[in-house]
Amino acid sequence: MSTKPIPEGYHSVTPVIIVKGATRLTDFLKKVFDAKVLMSYSGPNNTILHSEVLIGNSRLMIADAGPVFGAQTGSYYLYVDDTDAAYQRALAAGAKSEREPTNQFYGDRNASVVDEFGIRWSMATHVEDVSHEEMERRMKAMAPK
């Protein structure tokens, strides 16, 4: 039996978030996106050396910042079943609103929040299939005159 270059359950790209407070970030993701903890390895002083959570069908690796790797965050776009509900859960979990739920010209209803670590979480529900031609038309209509 040969070993696969990408392990079972992983995708070609797996985001890694490193923060001071990995446990708090994991709690936020569980509350907002129903994240499931797949594995977690503890380090000294109640830190997380490495953990993996599953959000929908995608893995996210999380760790506490330390002397080897400092904080590394980013911006993430997640598809969810209900943008409005996820947005409300994010606010209830302490995130700050960046954009309220809105239907976008490209067919997604999305919103974005920023958590206590400065991570931008954009959540979206695809509500309309938009052809390439229609998207171009809508973009031109939105362009400044």
Residue ranges and their predicted role:
Residues 1-8, 12-20, 50-54, 63, 65-145, ...:
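Vicinal oxygen chelate
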Residues 9, 40, 76-78, 105:
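Intrinsically disordered, low-complexity N-terminal regions enriched in serine/proline/glycine
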Residues 22, 32-35, 83, 90, ...:
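Long alpha-helical scaffolds
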Residues 7-9, 16-59:
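Core segments of cupin and vicinal oxygen chelate
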Residues 43-46, 68, 104-105:
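A short beta-turn/loop motif at secondary-structure boundaries
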